[in-house]
Amino acid sequence: MKLTDIIKGTEYDLSLFSDKQIAELENRIVERKTNGGGKYYLTCLVRKKEIKLTPEEVVRQLYLLVLIEDYRYSTSKMELEYEVTFGREKKRADIVIFDKQDTTAPFIIVEVKKPKLKDGKEQLKSYCNATGAPIGVWSNGKSISYNHRNDPYYFEDLSIIPRADQLLSVFFSVRW
């Protein structure tokens, strides 16, 4: 099964991801026959259970590979569908990477959204504000946006995010 078949007919795009990452994900896909035809699944790297592949889930699973392979984050420091509370309202952040020292504090929040930039950026910022996470990432598979929450309600654009082995203070001192 090709990932392009799963996203066909949508506005999703996988141009942010390498051929190697796409092939790695495609090799993990299994088809389950149902009365209405076939459905495609894979075992999630973080949840360690089989999940149905939707276009948004394809982008999320590919971005997990980026976080693991390129940025060296451990799946043990990640949670998917992390609950974020706003008063009595509860929402779910797509991917959360927890702080190295304070393992219950969100460090990076990643939102994977439909292919319209504004659809998720404000939501991502609200999640960062609600949790105190200093880094936010938004992606739809074609575009990506990295943000640093400098002060509450003030975000600056970043060109990359820190790797797992970088302290935030060192990351910011080196890049300038």
Where are these regions (language model features)?
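A short, conserved, highly charged catalytic patch centered on acidic carboxylates
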Residues: 1-135, 142-176
